[in-house]
Structure formats: C-alpha cells, structure tokens
Amino acid sequence: MSRLAEGRKELFEYALKLSETKLVFGTWGNISLRLCDKYYLITPSGIDYKELTPELLVRVRISDGAYFGDVKPSSESKMHTLIYRNRKDINAIVHTHSTNIQILSSIRKPFIVGEKVIYPVSKYSPSSTKKLALNVAKEFEQYNGVIIANHGFVVGAKSLEEALNIASETEIQAGVLLGEK
C-alpha cells in the first residue's frame, strides 16, 4: 500500500473518531496528516463528516498550499500549510469547534490544560483568512496548541492519536474551567 493510500485510511479513521467525540460538527473543524516533507492530507471543504470517504481527503503541497483533484481542501488549509511548513516536528493537526472551547475562545484569555500546558489565544481574524493562518502560525512558534479567538482550538502533534487526545483533554478541561460538573 502506498503512503498516500495508508495516509487516506489513517486520516479517515481519525476524522470519524473526531466526529464521534463531538469535537467537530457537520462541516465545522478539520484534521490533517503530514504524508512526507512535501505533502499532507486534509479533510475537504463543505462536506459533512457523516458523508466523508477516504477518497474525499485532499492532498495539499506544503510549499505553496496548492491542492490536487476536484475536491477543495478545508477552508482552513492555509493555517495547516503554514504550521506544517514552519514546524517539521508536527505530523498531525486537529482543529476543533467543540462547545466548551467555543465559549472559552470568546473570552480570549490563555488557560492551563491539565497541570502544565498553557495554550495562548491568537489575535482575532475572520475565519478562513490568510491573516488567521498567520496569527495562529505565529503562536505555533512557541506552542503546540492555540485557542483561536472567537473561533475554536487547533493542536499539532507527532501523531493523529496524540493530537486527538490533546484536543479531547482540552475540551474536558475547558468544561472544568466553565464550572461543568
């Protein structure tokens, strides 16, 4: 099996897990996987996770953000491209729009997840813009996760499993901060 086929299979499995954990809804949120130094795969734009298939995952070139095929990549692919370009140690990215994080992102204050990890809040920019991608990429110079002001959360990790686990933990901790029992 080729690396592209393996990547499609793995990313598809984790995209379904991401949806099942309610960290994303409908077409909101996205997930990607670095294939090699030149390319990554990402979920498509405008396609509900319930309708997703491995063939709909989009291959994107890291150097310039160009994509291959007829299906458009997530509208936040600019953000993923900049993170992969600047952080060679990151192999997977999860961007969530989960309930508790949505609330906390509107407060625009950094917070602690677990006992040690602090996630900053990026400067506000409209979604799907180059400015949002630049603001998030700037925070990724020092952090592996960022709360996107009035938007959601994005985390980069060595694997899809690690990125999904961090995103899940962050949503739980956000609930604790909001006083959920």
Language-model features, listed with the residues they occupy:
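Glycine-rich flexible loops
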Residues: 1-181
